[in-house]
Amino acid sequence: MQLVHGGDWAGYRAEFGRDALDFSANVSPLGLPEGVKNAIIRALPKADRYPDPLCRELRGKLAKTEGLPAEHILCGNGAADLIFRLALAAKPKKALLPAPSFAEYSSALETVGCELKRHILQESDDFAVTERFLDDIDKSVDVVFLCQPNNPTGQLTDLAMVERILRRCKECGAV
C-alpha cells in the first residue's frame, strides 16, 4: 500500500510537464523565508546526525513554558506522524469522522484495522459539522476525529458544537 500525503510536485510535473501551485500540503509557493534559510545553514554542522527521537530538549522547553510534565508532551514529524502514532497507540475498533476530512485520519485508522463510520457532510449545510453529527456518536464508537478547521472544506466547527461533541463523547465513552 502506498500512502501519498500531498505535496507531490514531482508526480504532477511528470504527468503534466509543468509545475503547479500545490495547496494539498503546507508548502509555500513563495519559497523559503530568509530566516529559515539561515537556520538551515546554522544547523548544517549537525546534519550528519539523526535528531533526538524523543525530542528531549524541545519537550523540556515546552514543558517549562506550559507548566506541564515533559511526559505529557508528544512531539512528532508533522500532524500525519502524530495521527498514525495515536492510531497505533489506541488501536480503536470503530471511529467516527466527518467526510470529507483529512485523509490521514482514515489511512491511520485503516492501518490498525479500525472500522470507519463516516458522517457525510452536506453541501446544503455548507459542509459544516451540524447537530446530526451528534447522532452518530454512540457506544459503539471508540474515537471521534474532528479537524479544526476541517480539511479540505476549510469549515470551522464553532466552539459550542465542539463542546456538545465532547459531552456526547464522554457520555458514550468515546475519545
Predicted regions and their residues:
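Short loop-beta-helix segment that forms the pyridoxal 5′-phosphate
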Residues: 51, 63-85
